[in-house]
Amino acid sequence: MRVREPAVAGTFYPKDKEELNKLMDLLCGFEPKEKIKPKAILVPHAGYIYSGKTACEVYKRIEIPEKVVLLGPNHTGLGKPISVYSGDAWETPYGVVEIDGELREKILKYPYANPDEYAHLYEHSLEVQLPFLQRYARREFKILPIVVTFVEYEVAKDFGRFLGEVLKEEDALIVISSDMSHYVPAEEARKKDEILISAMERLNTEELYFKAVQYNITMCGVVPAVVGIESAKVLGATKGIVVDYSNSGDTTGDYSQVVAYLGMIFL
């Protein structure tokens, strides 16, 4: 059994289970009794002290089904353009989560999707989502991690629609992992991000992709967002709803150079 060990436990989040629990309790606070069942969510992937609260605001509100597809960007440059994790399980301080092998085989029928471990070895964007899922899941679940590089819009859109058709047969959640604007003043980040948030609220992936390029908006997961939103549309989603927006300055006190974080639910 090939188990991916945590690459960023101890840096992005505590590697000790009890310390992780304490931080989660601090960040997440009150958990609503009523849960939402979205087609997809968008959550950030920075260190928990920076973006954990925004991620929590989404995760604590949703029902987590038996299958979770994780879509994230490739920060390392390793692996294939559309990299579907080829191992058996992922580990975090909360334990081991199995990979959904049957779902993987269906996804690998897409021409540009490849089985791969290299893109996932050191990639943090999907790993940091797992402890949130483990904390709030009310039953066992399996995952399918997919890392996507900056592919052309038509490829991302087409893959998203393919993924959506596959997931029509499943009880599944799509998790899109992305931070928003990087290393700009907080006011500039908000103005730029509002352009992309507006597109995502309307599920307009073409506008999302090309305005990110046109205005040089450094949303690292714009391509995973195109894939995930197109999938959600196939599954019946009609809108995106902003749950939370924050930036690193809220933690550091320095608003002159921030990374911005967004939490969204797609229904």
From Swiss-Prot:
The record's section on InterPro entries has: MEMO1_fam
| Cysteine pairings via disulfide bonds | none
The record ties this protein, via Gene3D superfamilies, to: LigB-like
Q: Which residues form the signal peptide?
A: none
SUPFAM superfamilies xrefs? LigB-like
Which HAMAP family does the record cross-reference, listed alphabetically?
A: MEMO1
The family note in this entry says:
Belongs to the MEMO1 family.
Task: Indicate what this protein is called per its UniProt record.
Answer: MEMO1 family protein aq_890
